[in-house]
Structures are given as structure tokens and as C-alpha cells.
Amino acid sequence: MSVDQQDDAPLRERIQENPGPALKWFAGALLLFSFEAGAVINFLTGLVGAPVDLPTLLTRDLIANNGYQTPGGAWKETFLNLAPAYAWAIRVVLVYAYAFIWMLWLWRGYLVFREHYRYADWTPRDDMVDRLRGHRWGQFGAVIVFGFIVLALFAPALGPTTVERTISNPYSHHIEYYNDQGQLENITVGSANLGSRSQGTPDRNVGPMQYDDFGRFHPFGTLPTGKDMFTFMAAGARVSLFIGLISIGVSGLIAVAFALLTAYYKGLVDLAVVIVGDSIMSLPRLLFVMLLSVVLGETWIADIYSGGFVLALIFAGTGWPFLWRSVRGPAMQVSEQEWIDAAKSFGQRPRVTMQKHMAPYILGYLLVYASMTLGGIIVAVAGLSFLGLGINPPTPEWGRAVNIGQSYVTTSSWHISFIPGVMIVLVVTAFNALGDGIRDAIDPQSEGGESDGAEVAASGGGA
């Protein structure tokens, strides 16, 4: 295949010419996926309310931390008869190690693509990646975002117990423990929760990294209802991530479509979108979201993911003008470039021109503002839950934990509000830091002054 033919060949044909490296990488990825396929499938099916129970390598069934302590001090029915805290810590370390290996393997896949299947020895994306790898603030954000995503994706494995056992149906599950008389008793999880409540006094509090009277380990302590707080926070991370990704995905598609249309056609098309977008942006967003949450709260759509889906659609419908405004400028810059005029003069269809020659150069900017917007959505969802709106109880949500723990801030149960509050601040800061890193990688002159429009457009994701 000649160089010119190779330049125009799709990736599929390039892989067919040299399938060896791609097959080796895919085999490794398939092996990694097989270890935790059940966790991923459970996450995807859980989004539509039909979770399945499939075996995985790092589940609590294999590395169990739910057991009981004998009068002699030994633990039974835990992994290797270890204390629940150690068994839980081993499982957490292995899950995060597994996720980190996945990240390394994805990076390896990118290097394989660069070495064997990319027709150019260098592209502007290479410099972007190098700048991002040296951006300490962006790296900080990436590490925290990575931890947040892993917490959400593997929430059932990371929690010391499950949402089903401690939150949804605690009276349908039982645990065993030795009472003060040294007798083995069987009690429902709900009854054990009542005896493990954190309510602000030393004798009614289970704080971070403590055991309750029934031998259960609580990394973040318990809630005023006695439910495990780490499990609550992990499940809440999954809810926040679901809402954020759906919202950003929908609003991002709308923003890109309108940005390309307004940049290509300009004139009345641009004016119409400006009027619609400005009208939506002029509304008090939080009040508008609260109004829609109440209005749509009694509809069938509010039952999907405990109200999370309707929240995602509301944030998408009210947030796309902000993303569109962010990428409209770069789209206008790209539309003035010579290659766009050349495509028009050769009679190329507008859809092909926008998709092939314009869209790649604004996706980098969309990624920057989307990462920052995602942090804002997490705060907004937490705020709505704090006010009693949004996610329907008893589905876990971080803002609800802040709300129910605010009366215990100055007591021994300070952890109930403090931990979710810190996590909200940390995750939102991390998304903003990651966005800053991506922005500086795309446009290295963004902090030092104005950069040339063509250079900025070319670095925004072109091949």
C-alpha cells in the first residue's frame, strides 16, 4: 500500500494489513475484562433497574469481610479468617490495582496505535499528551477523578456491605454475632443497624474505621439510621456519575451539533440558536431545575433510576447553551480556515464537511468545558438532594448525607456531614483541575496571552 493510499485508508484496513499488535492488545484486554466482567455487566444492567448477579474475581464472595468474632478473639467466615478491616482493605487495594492495570493497558493500546497504525509519525495530539503528562495540577485532578470513577463502577465490591443488605432491604438479611454471654445469636441487619446508630453521643456513635457491637467494620462510620456510610457514599458516587455522564453526553451532542450548524451556515441559523440559547441561559437555572424536578417528579420517567434519569435530562436541557457558547467560538474560527473553503468549493456535502473537517477541532474544547461542567452537576445534584428534591429516597446520594448529618457537626458524629462534604469539594475540584490541564495542553498559550486562532484550532484535536 502506497503512502497516499495509507493516508486515506480507514483504521480497519490498516489493522488488516498488520493484525499482530492489535490482536495481542485485544487478547490482553479481553483477559482483563474477564476478571471483572460481572461487575461491569452489573453496573450496566443496574442502570435500567435489572441488575444481575454474576461472579467476579474480586467480589466479597471471594474476599469476604462479613463474619463474626468468637469469644476467643478469632474471626470466622472472613477471608483467611482475617479481621473484617483487613479483608476489606485487601479487596479495596486489589480492585484499585485492577483498575490501574486497565489504565496502563489502555495507554499501551494508544502506544500500539501510534507505532503501528497511525499513518503520521507526529500529530498535534502528541504534543497535547506530552503537555498533559507534565501538568501537575491536571494530574492531581486525573488521579482523584480516576478514584471517583472506580468507586462508582465497583461500588458493590468496594463497600464493606451491599446496598441491598444495609439500605434497601435490611430486614431481609441476617448476621451472626456472639453476645455478652458468649452465645452465638442471629439477628436481622435492620435490627443491627438500630443498635449501630450514630446520633452524636459517645455511647451512640460508630465513627470512621470502627467496629459496631455486632462485629461489622465501618470505614466511614455509620449514619443516624445505623446504615454503613461507606456503602452509602459508594452507591451515591454511582448515582452522581450516572447523572453527570448522561447529562454531559446529551448536552454535549446538542452543543456540538448547534456549534457546527451555526459556524457553517451563520446568518439566520446562528441568530435563531443565539436567541434560543440566551433565553434558556437567562432563566435562574437552579430554580428552573427545582421546578422541573417537582413537575416531573410524579411522572413515569421519574421512576427510572430513582429520579436520576429525569434529573440528567433536565440538566442536559438547561445546560447545552453553556457548552454551545464555549465551543461556538472555536467552531467559528475553524469555519474561516482555508480547508473549509476548499471543501465547499469542491462541492463536498455540508454534513461531511462539518463531521470530517470541523468537528475534530472543537472536541478538545468540549472535553475541557464538559469536565468542568460535570463537577457543577455533581454539586447541583447534591444541592437538590440536600433540599429534599432530586433523587428519591432511599437511593443513596451525597447531598442527603450532608443534610441528615448537619445537626451532628459539633458532636462525636461529625463524620456524617464532614466526609460527604469533603468528598464533594474534592471531586468537583478534581474535575476542574482536569479541565484546566486539558485546556493548557490544547492551548499552551492560554495562560500567557492570546494564541493564534489557526494554531488553537489545529491543536484542538486534529489528526
Description of each model-found segment:
Residues 1-140, 153-225, 450-463:
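Membrane-topology segments of multi-pass transport proteins
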Residues 19, 23, 27-30, 241-254, ...:
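Transmembrane alpha-helices
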Residues 36-52, 60-90, 137-138, 152, ...:
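Generic hydrophobic transmembrane alpha-helix motif, especially the helices
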Residues 132, 233, 237, 241, ...:
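Hydrophobic alpha-helical elements at and bordering transmembrane segments
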Residues 283, 289-292, 309-323, 333, ...:
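Hydrophobic transmembrane alpha-helices
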Residues 290-296, 334, 373-419, 423, ...:
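Glycine-rich helix-loop "coupling/hinge" segments at transmembrane-helix boundaries
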Residues 297-307, 318, 364, 371-372, ...:
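C-terminal transmembrane helix and the adjacent membrane-cytosol boundary/short C-terminal tail
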